[in-house]
Curated annotation (Swiss-Prot):
It holds the Pfam family KH_2. It comes from Dinoroseobacter shibae (strain DSM 16493 / NCIMB 14021 / DFL 12). This is Small ribosomal subunit protein uS3. SUPFAM superfamilies: Prokaryotic type KH domain (KH-domain type II) (SSF54814), Ribosomal protein S3 C-terminal domain (SSF54821). The gene is rpsC. Binds the lower part of the 30S subunit head. Binds mRNA in the 70S ribosome, positioning it for translation.
Amino acid sequence: MGNKVNPIGMRLQVNRTWDSRWYADTKDYGDLLLEDLKIREFIKEECKQAGISRVIIERPHKKCRVTIHTARPGVIIGKKGADIEGLRRKIAAMTDSELHLNIVEVRKPELDAALVGESIAQQLERRVSFRRAMKRAVQNAVRMGAQGIRVNLAGRLGGAEIARTEWYREGRVPLHTLRADIDFANVEATTAYGIIGIKVWIFKGEIMEHDPQARDRRHAELQEGGGPRPQGGGRPRRDR
């Protein structure tokens, strides 16, 4: 049932770790969890055009460290850092802890599942052909070194009366292999005909070491250099 479970949750503590990294007593846990959700929702709403990939929240002693992974850091920082200071003040008002805000650039957005999904969603909302958007995303990921990618669209595709599912795959996407480094994202596109669900799986290779931090280290190396070229062909498929 590898295709039924979230690939990220399945690999936690195997080769990747959580996006919220802190410990709290039982009486404080619920408040801090709700605070994390509000901070993430606020950042994604406030920085819609910045291409937000991940928001990592760490809470060392009486502090709150927020790290934003973005494809366009200049949009968040603004001219002479004016925008990021405004963002810092707004986030600081949402937490009682001392805030530290960091910005990390995603150098290869074509290999980030969340950014690929957002790109497809924006194209669908601009009435671009869904097949063209899917193929373009797959081709860009393969060109940048992904070993495999799968894109799944579900809904009233092309304004059809009956909703259906279509997907494209290039290379390998081994969902059952725990050592596989698979990035996953689930995005929604709001079109005139209704919501279209977008799922993206990107296979970047295998991680042999059993370490929750291994994926983050490998991801940083992949952003700096090129990845291996994929093997195998694509297989388009449509499910009604």
